[in-house]
A protein has these predicted regions:
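Proline-centered turn/helix-capping motifs that create local helix->coil transitions or kinks
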Residues: 31-41, 104-107, 145-148
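Active-site/catalytic core of tyrosine-dependent DNA strand-transfer enzymes
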Residues: 117-118, 134-183
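C-terminal catalytic core of tyrosine-transesterase DNA break-rejoin enzymes
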Residues: 29-32, 83, 87, 93-94, ...
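Short, Lys/Arg-enriched alpha-helical recognition elements, typified by the DNA-recognition helix
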Residues: 1-29, 43, 174
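Short, polar N-cap/turn motifs at the start of nucleic acid-interacting alpha helices
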Residues: 102-109, 183-184, 201-207
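Exposed loop/turn and edge beta-strand positions of beta-sandwich/beta-sheet ligand-binding modules
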Residues: 53, 78, 108, 127, ...
Length: 207
């Protein structure tokens, strides 16, 4: 039932597998620490081949503009998160786990610093980087900063001292993307779109 619920929330097969792996590890540790005998109900759960593991296609430019316009019209925290990612191509967990101090607007070039935090790790060491804030991402950063003045986190809806709720954000935002521009696109698609946008202007590969 939990597996089916995950799919109903819009998660793809890879996301559901990661969720189950995390829960399975937690239960295994708890059973060992407390000497609980028996089997882990999350071990060996059947995962159907849904054919959605590779649906991360780039978002066409027209659809990208539609998304950004909807974000600015709706103007709420989930849409600021989408807008920030749309022109930076950050991973969702990277963006959702940002601290307010990671946003630097008073520099010659406004930018966001991607770095690890106690509540959110980065995927790899090479994931630490600085990204310019332009276009819709700059608007989103300004709006999120203005609204989160009471919190150390840029997106307090998705982040607190206990961790970053990237999985729940992913499910909700993927569902919103589907409602906005149709099937076949997920939050990770913004990374593929940025790759194509950079190639279109002959950006050096090392960038």
């Amino acid at each position: 039932q939990f597996r089916d619920w995950c799919f109903e929330q819009g998660m793809n097969i890879n996301t559901v597998k990661r969720v189950f792996a995390s829960v399975r590890s937690i239960i295994n540790l708890t059973m060992r620490e407390h000497g609980i005998e028996g089997s882990n109900a999350f071990s060996g759960t059947f995962m159907p081949d849904r054919g959605d593991a590779s649906t991360r296609q780039p978002i066409p430019t027209d659809n990208l503009r539609t998304i950004q316009q909807r974000c600015q019209t709706t103007d709420d925290e989930p849409r600021w998160l989408v807008a920030l990612i749309s022109d930076t191509a950050m991973r969702l967990s990277e963006a959702a786990g940002l601290a307010r101090e990671d946003i630097v607007l008073d520099a010659d070039i406004p930018h966001v610093i991607i770095r690890p935090h106690p509540w959110r790790r980065l995927k790899t060491k090479g994931s630490e980087r600085t990204l310019p804030l332009v276009g819709c991402s700059l608007w989103a950063a300004e709006r999120a900063l203005e609204a989160s003045h009471h919190s150390p986190y840029l997106f307090p809806r998705y982040c607190n001292e206990n961790g970053c709720k990237a999985n729940s954000a992913s499910a909700a935002l993927n569902k919103w993307l589907k409602q906005t521009i149709g099937d076949g696109y997920v939050m990770h698609s913004f990374r593929h779109s940025m790759r194509d946008r950079l190639r279109a202007v002959n950006c050096p590969s090392e960038m």
